[in-house]
Amino acid sequence: MSEQEVKELDLNGEMLVRREKLSALRAKGNAFPNKFRRDALAQDLHNQYDSEDGEILKEKGVEVQVAGRIMTRRAMGKATFITIQDMSGKIQLYVARDNLPEGVYAEDVGNWDLGDIIGVKGTLFKTKTNELTIKTTEVQLLTKALRPLPDKFHGLTDQEVRYRQRYLDLISNEESRRTFIIRSKVVAGIREYFISKGFMEVETPMLQVIPGGASARPFVTHHNALDVDMYLRIAPELYLKRLVVGGFERVFELNRNFRNEGVSVRHNPEFTMLEYYQAYADYHDLMDNTEELLRKLAIDILGTTIVKYGDLEFDFGKPFERITLHDATVKYGADKGIVKEDLYDFDRAKATAERLGIEVQKSWGLGSIVNAIFEEVAEHHLIQPTFLMAHPAEISPLARRNDENPEVTDRFELFIGGREIGNGFSELNDAEDQNERFDAQVAAKEAGDDEAMFKDEDFVVALEHGLPPTAGEGLGIDRLAMLYANAPSIRDVILFPAMRQK
């Protein structure tokens, strides 16, 4: 018999015993009572009473009602020490036969298992080791767990099980709970920041007839009632800019985007983005906003501007570096013989790319080739917080051209730890230029570029009504959560990440 078969046999045996206990509870009446009301959380009690002197605490006679899942139990004859866990943390219970009604200790407490959810009433005291504990006087089993906790709750270490059965991961791993608390604080902090700046939160369509706002491959579905193919949105950008045309001059949205592309430690097909748009601002203003926001989040969540990520350390209290895409490519590609002139001539750029082993697509112009060279030689060097600026117009179809050099745009990407965290630019509000760029994207798509943008003629019509000078940015919430929680994979910060079916 294999080790796995032995484990399954043991599991089936333990579940059988637990089901028998549940049957006995059903025979007594309501096996799943729901009238218990707690008046305290574990961590709140620790915060308030951990520093209290034991004798003074005993004299106060503080009575509490708590509930949670049984994580450990240690029987000592006529008494049992139990640790329960609620949403805030853990607390110890002292359950003694003499403190409970007759028969309760033997008949009820004796049949509790790890993983069961209980509610208790009792008074606070300190043990000989000075641990805050509840001396229980009333107990109630609220939910019988039919399956045991993983590995007798010594931890859930199988990474795939952690992702597929996140509920077990959250029960078993304090670090996972901390990660998702941090993620929640990131989202709440972002919302608070933009509302305080006078932005209005809005919601735009998830199902779109034309998927616009980014270069990506969309998911396709079909609307039966309308008998039309639709797409899960890849970005909300074009709808948000329509709202600016309509007079909502500061808008933001925190919501999901979907891209039918690869899965990796940095990519999940369903992910959360912040997008915001500010009229009468440019991309420099947005870079300033971003620095301020990330600094505030670090202080509010971590209590410091220092953010540690793996072996790296970032100081969000310092100004972020700002460098153009071309300058970064020359700076970090110098050891590979790249010079500035290689990036401003199509033939030289193509030859440089091919020398680096880059497969140049037929649909690529100079801008796409230069971007590919940057990604090959420079991107992974952008470790400390860096705003990469002045992207080629060819790869920035929605961004405003730079006044001094129309071949590049007033655009930036934020890189931290060698990863793109955000993307923003001064918006293109020239309707005729936008129409021409959409046509160029259509030509690229017809030439085989699956990620080229669709043409949105209604958006062009909106621009023809007049978009004020505007700047907009998208920030990846998942990647920000990875940073603040020091999580190595995007799956660690998404509660239920996409997984291949077994």
UniProtKB/Swiss-Prot annotation:
Top-rank EC class of the record's enzyme: ligase
PROSITE patterns the UniProt entry points to: AA_TRNA_LIGASE_II (PS50862)
Compartments reported by the entry: Cytoplasm
Keywords assigned: Aminoacyl-tRNA synthetase, ATP-binding, Cytoplasm, Ligase, Magnesium, Metal-binding, Nucleotide-binding, Protein biosynthesis
Catalysis performed (reactions): tRNA(Lys) + L-lysine + ATP = L-lysyl-tRNA(Lys) + AMP + diphosphate
GO cellular component: cytosol
GO molecular function: ATP binding; lysine-tRNA ligase activity; magnesium ion binding; tRNA binding
Note describing how the cofactor binds: Binds 3 Mg(2+) ions per subunit.
InterPro entries, alphabetized: Aa-tRNA-synt_II (IPR004364), aa-tRNA-synth_II (IPR006195), aa-tRNA-synth_II/BPL/LPL (IPR045864), Lys-tRNA-ligase_II (IPR002313), Lys-tRNA-ligase_II_bac/euk (IPR034762), Lys-tRNA-ligase_II_N (IPR044136), Lys-tRNA-synth_II_C (IPR018149), NA-bd_OB-fold (IPR012340)
Pfam family, one: tRNA_anti-codon
Predominant subcellular localization, coarse grouping: cytoplasm
Cofactor requirements of the protein: Mg(2+)
E.C. code: 6.1.1.6
Family to which this protein belongs: Belongs to the class-II aminoacyl-tRNA synthetase family.
Subunit structure: Homodimer.
Alphabetical list of PANTHER family matching this protein: LYSINE--TRNA LIGASE, CHLOROPLASTIC_MITOCHONDRIAL, LYSYL-TRNA SYNTHETASE
UniProt protein name: Lysine--tRNA ligase
Species this protein is from: Haemophilus influenzae (strain PittEE)
